[in-house]
């Protein structure tokens, strides 16, 4: 029996509001995170991902409070990321009601943190978020590099090798965002999605670039992803989660 593929709406939260940008810039307001999360829960989303994009020191308490509110009203798994740097940060988020915690920049600066987190809390609740950008030119062997700081800083790290290293350290899941595609609405970068999905034994969540339901199906069929994440197509009412599930099921994808 094939494992069901998950559909995960993503909430990018800035100072307690859901926002959506294009290529990590040009932010527009999409509403209250708890209300939006509740709507997705009612629609039958498999999980919710909540990324705190302020992640400033003053924004921390707001985030924990929002996570507490969300966890008390939403009964599907909740992954929270943004500014997670210490074991205590993870503990605080899990105590607030998160089911999984996503680590991004901190993993690049201190890979052992991922191993430490997995040992403390178990791989099942540690997600490593990877922001990848294509760095190879036409005619070259495809290569993607890891970027940090919202896609602004190159690291020199090869995305596929890095994902394998994270799995080895104990990550339970990879959240893969294509920086080239983010907010562009012309589909996932299927090359990097497939390369990483095929190289790993843990689930890969495809993110960045969904503009229609075909893109979600492509992420699974061509990108070999275990789950697909989208924001703006759901937030602004273009499509609903049930429509997405029906579309994928009609293409032979097992959904919950």
Curated annotation (Swiss-Prot):
InterPro entries: Aldolase_TIM, His_biosynth, HisF, IGPS_HisA/HisF, RibuloseP-bd_barrel. The keyword Oxidoreductase does not apply. It holds the Pfam family His_biosynth. CDD domains: HisF. The keyword Cytoplasm applies. Pathway: Amino-acid biosynthesis; L-histidine biosynthesis; L-histidine from 5-phospho-alpha-D-ribose 1-diphosphate: step 5/9. GO terms for cellular component: cytoplasm. It comes from the Bacteria. One of its GO terms (molecular function) is imidazoleglycerol-phosphate synthase activity. GO terms for biological process: L-histidine biosynthetic process. It is found in: Cytoplasm. The active site is at residues 12, 131. It catalyses: 5-[(5-phospho-1-deoxy-D-ribulos-1-ylimino)methylamino]-1-(5-phospho-beta-D-ribosyl)imidazole-4-carboxamide + L-glutamine = D-erythro-1-(imidazol-4-yl)glycerol 3-phosphate + 5-amino-1-(5-phospho-beta-D-ribosyl)imidazole-4-carboxamide + L-glutamate + H(+). Its EC number is 4.3.2.10. Keywords: Amino-acid biosynthesis, Cytoplasm, Histidine biosynthesis, Lyase. Belongs to the HisA/HisF family. Heterodimer of HisH and HisF. IGPS catalyzes the conversion of PRFAR and glutamine to IGP, AICAR and glutamate. The HisF subunit catalyzes the cyclization activity that produces IGP and AICAR from PRFAR using the ammonia provided by the HisH subunit. This is Imidazole glycerol phosphate synthase subunit HisF. The lineage of its organism: Bacteria, Pseudomonadati, Pseudomonadota, Gammaproteobacteria, Pseudomonadales.
